[in-house]
Amino acid sequence: MQLESKNLPLLISEVKEGLIKTIQATHPQAKDIRDNMFRSLAKEFETFTDIYTTNYDIFLYKIILANNTLNQLKVENMGDFGDGFFEEISSGRLGFQDFDIKPRNLIYLHSSLFIFNQNGNTYKIHKIDGKVEYINLIQIELDNNNFPVYVAEGRADKKYMEINDNYYLRMALNRLKKRNGDLITFGFSFGKSDKHIVDAINSSDTSIIVASIYPDKTESQLSAEISRITNLFPNKGVQFFDSRTMFTFDFPKYAY
């Protein structure tokens, strides 16, 4: 499909406006979630090393920041989190370096709303002024016609092509391929469009997959779901747990 050049600015404007509205509707502002909630969740994450996410929002990022703050204050000693973005390329922008700089990592398998690419360079925007909301920083990037890097929903082969076109996303998926030990998944459906993730886990040295199941189905539906996921990993051990028992999102479980 070809677009007339005169329609392109209008299309770009509509995409930007739609993206901002989506972020505003789905992403909580800092004032909506207290710091003690993020710190409590950071404590619940204590047993995890690398965390892989396919979510685009920055909720998990705020949890790892809370984790690092607790360590800096010497309230906890849980091991710092990083996400591979450490190189200061300009004010408020960090370029990707490596996942091995910090002992624990948050890895965005499908990228995130605050990760952008300009002239082939992938960078993460970060706050210089703590009072500024991330949505405002994202708005500035959009106003400069810079759009977030993200792997859109669609066919598995299309997703895989998008990942291979971006250095950071390739490194993120390769990190999953090279992992070992047990893998706990939470809120991930292992759908057909995420075959690249299933393939990465199957090619890794992961020994056991512990997958969450939300029990809002009939017994036969749950049985079918368990069988479907188990069959995706013929050479791995697969176990399941009730997703409601994993984390406490309604109130801080730990007081800080």
Model-identified regions with their sequence ranges:
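Short acidic, glycine/Ser/Thr-rich loop/turn "cap" segments at secondary-structure junctions
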Residues: 18-26, 41-48
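SIR2/sirtuin-family catalytic core signature
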Residues: 159, 170-256
